[in-house]
Amino acid sequence: MTTATSSNISSKLPSIRGEIEANAPLAPLTWFRVGGNAEWLVSPYDTEDLSDFLKKIDPSMPVRVLGIGSNVIIRDGGVSGVIIRLPRRFSWVKREEGNRLRCGGSTLGMMISKVAAAESLTNLEFMRGIPGSIGGMIRMNAGAYGGDISKILIQVTLVRRNGDIEIWPVEKLNFAYRYSELPEDAIVTEALFQGQPGDKDKIEAQMNKIIAEREASQPVRSRTGGSTFKNPEGYKAWELIDEAGCRGLKIGDAEVSTKHANFLLNLGDATAADIENLGEEVRARVKAKFGITLEWEIKRIGHKLDGDKA
């Protein structure tokens, strides 16, 4: 345990074998590098530790999960309650019979695709182009380059808010475009994926193509949260944003990327409010021009500061 004293923690939260930090800065844990602190940041030792913690914690205590922070805005006022962040101990991949890969809940899609290539397993190449850990990828049915999670997932192990450990088959998640019925209180600790035998050289060539295309078309080396808005049915969000005159639009140090209009950037000193306000301005302009309401793909969590517009 760090930051808070043991007595202070024990009066508020049950003990764990992992780590608990009070008033923990969250900005360094997100790709935008903005936002306030978590009241409590909890890193469980393993699935059983997480389950035991959730069984003992006050049911009224708010609990949320944070992955690698690639598709989220933490608001400037911080987050009340507990933020669960699975540590590196949950990042692993192993091959199982039947051309399957099992991985831990904090494993990056990039890592899974690399292991799949090393094992000459195909159909997982698209993960190479998606920033994020597996829990968030499952929740939003992440996809790119012709693939998505729903096409390869077999089952998922999750821990519920009451501490129950459950295994859900893919059918129970009722996947749709950028959507799943994974419960809001669920924390993914393991996932099992189905690969297919393939040619290692072809798999690696496809992954290299994905990397090159992503580098050429997206601001991957900037402080960004990935795709900001979902594509409305029949449209591409970036085209609507571009045609509404939003490419390069700025609020404070937040900017609509000139490289890909569906990406928002922190140019250096943006606040979470700057970024969220910019996103809302984009939504307003697209609505005014096309009558289409863009739906946020990026999650926004936490409290706004007094006076914030967003």
From Swiss-Prot:
GO terms for cellular component: cytosol. The keyword Oxidoreductase applies. It catalyses: UDP-N-acetyl-alpha-D-muramate + NADP(+) = UDP-N-acetyl-3-O-(1-carboxyvinyl)-alpha-D-glucosamine + NADPH + H(+). It holds the Pfam family FAD_binding_4. Its cofactor is FAD. One of its GO terms (biological process) is cell division. PROSITE patterns: FAD_PCMH. Cell wall formation. This is UDP-N-acetylenolpyruvoylglucosamine reductase. The lineage of its organism: Bacteria, Pseudomonadati, Pseudomonadota, Alphaproteobacteria, Sphingomonadales. The gene is murB.
